Swiss-Prot record:
This is NAD(P)H-quinone oxidoreductase subunit N. The gene is ndhN. Keywords: Membrane, NAD, NADP, Plastoquinone, Quinone, Thylakoid, Translocase, Transport. It comes from the Bacteria. It comes from Prochlorococcus marinus (strain MIT 9303). One of its GO terms (molecular function) is quinone binding. It is found in: Cellular thylakoid membrane. Its EC number is 7.1.1.-.
C-alpha cells in the first residue's frame, strides 16, 4: 500500500457500485485514512459493527424495539414473559437531512449471512444517497471489490 492514498479510485468505485466488500490489513490504519478522505470529499460517514445488526433496513431507517440485556434476578410480573422492550432511534435517519451522500462503514462483516449482504446491496440500489462498505476480513494489502462480485450475483 502506498504511503499516501488519495482515495480517488476508492470513491469512484464506491459511487459506481454503491456497496463494496473490503479486505484490510490487520494492523489497521487504512480504513481510518479512507474515512478521513471521504469526509474531506463531502460524504457523511457512520462507523458501526455488523454484529447484532439484524434486519438492515429496519435497523438503519426505522424506529425499532430492542430488549436490553438481562442483568440478573428481576421481577417478571412487571414486563411479562418477553421482557422489557425499548424503542431505539434509527442509525442513519439524521444523516439524510441534506442531499449529501452517506457512507455506512460496517466492521466485522464476515459474520453477516449472504441474505443480509444481499439486503445491504438492495438497500443501496433503492436509496441512491447511501453507500455501504463492509469489511470482510483481513488481507496483506488493502483491496476492495463490489459486493455483487463477491456474492456472485
Amino acid at each position: 500500500m502506498p504511503l499516501l492514498l488519495s482515495g480517488r479510485v476508492f470513491r469512484r468505485d464506491l459511487d459506481a457500485c454503491g456497496c463494496l466488500a473490503m479486505h484490510v490489513p490487520l494492523e489497521g490504519g487504512s480504513e481510518t485514512r479512507l474515512l478521513r478522505r471521504l469526509r474531506a470529499a463531502g460524504y457523511r460517514t457512520q462507523l458501526s459493527s455488523a454484529r447484532g445488526l439484524g434486519d438492515p433496513e429496519v435497523f438503519l431507517f426505522q424506529l425499532h424495539g430492542i430488549r436490553p440485556p438481562h442483568l440478573g434476578h428481576q421481577s417478571v410480573g412487571r414486563n411479562g414473559a418477553v421482557g422489557e422492550v425499548q424503542q431505539v432511534m434509527p442509525q442513519l435517519a439524521e444523516l439524510f437531512v441534506d442531499n449529501v451522500p452517506v457512507v455506512l462503514w460496517l466492521l466485522e462483516g464476515q459474520v453477516l449471512s449472504r441474505s443480509e449482504l444481499l439486503a445491504l446491496c438492495d438497500l443501496c440500489k433503492r436509496e441512491s444517497r447511501l453507500r455501504v462498505v463492509v469489511e470482510m476480513g483481513g488481507a496483506r494489502s488493502l483491496n476492495w471489490q463490489p459486493m455483487s462480485t463477491l456474492l456472485g450475483v
